Amino acid sequence: MTDTTTNRVVSLKALLEAGVHFGHQTKRWNPKMRPFIFTDRNGIHIIDLQQTVTSLQSAYRFVADAVAGGGKVLFVGTKKQAQEAVRDEATRSNQLYVTQRWMGGLLTNFSTIKRRLQFLHDLEARRDRGEFNLVTKAEALKLEDEIVKLNRVFGGIKTMERLPAAMFVIDPHKETLAISEAKKLGIPVVAMVDTNCDPDPIDYPIPSNDDAIRAIRLMAGKIADAALEGQNRRQSQHIEERALAEQTKYEEDAF
């Protein structure tokens, strides 16, 4: 696995340093991951990083295009070692995230979730207007506790006004419910797939160690970079369209 490919998304050196190539024990593998496995060493499967590079490039292009088209990406990583990276990278790229337990119906029953989000927004607005000062101290504390509780569950999706254009998952083996909801709604799924995963339900599988914190942060960071690229493209397009509209208006007014 020599680094013969120059590519702007990620290098083999970066993947190696993050431990992306380390899979699970050979006895814990999913045979469907065979095409993504390079070899095994001391009872551990070693992921083919050339395929990781290619897969990540495809996922990167897809995410950038989805965001450039006005969509949002929902990052999902509820296991402990994924939570911080998922929260940080989704926030950095102005995307959505879930790091606590996946709430059933979050996507498939989004109308109900939207009502809960509106309730949270209303509570925070009341607090910001000073309305909590107009109720008893006990009632104010109860309302503050409700805000904290709702933010713990919904904090990463507070700005979600419609269904996401894509989902990025850290560990499909753990996030089966989230993936199931996305598939029912036709939402494309990008995911890190370790050697114990089933890649079949994933639209853009990225073969990778999904347990090592450095590997998770690297991949989440690249998907966040793709989202930022998409945002920049969208903003540039809006600027060009606005300039064209102003030029057209100027020419019309001149006649």
From Swiss-Prot:
Short name of one Pfam family: Ribosomal_S2
GO biological process: translation
Ribosomal protein keyword on record: yes
SUPFAM superfamilies: Ribosomal protein S2
GO function term, MF aspect, one: structural constituent of ribosome
InterPro entries cross-referenced by the UniProt entry: Ribosomal_uS2 (IPR001865), Ribosomal_uS2_bac/mit/plastid (IPR005706), Ribosomal_uS2_CS (IPR018130), Ribosomal_uS2_flav_dom_sf (IPR023591)
Domain of life: Bacteria
Cell membrane found in the keyword field: no
Assigned keywords, A-Z: Ribonucleoprotein, Ribosomal protein
GO terms for cellular component: cytosolic small ribosomal subunit
Family label: Belongs to the universal ribosomal protein uS2 family.
NCBIfam families hit by this protein: rpsB_bact
Name assigned to this protein: Small ribosomal subunit protein uS2
Gene behind the chain: rpsB
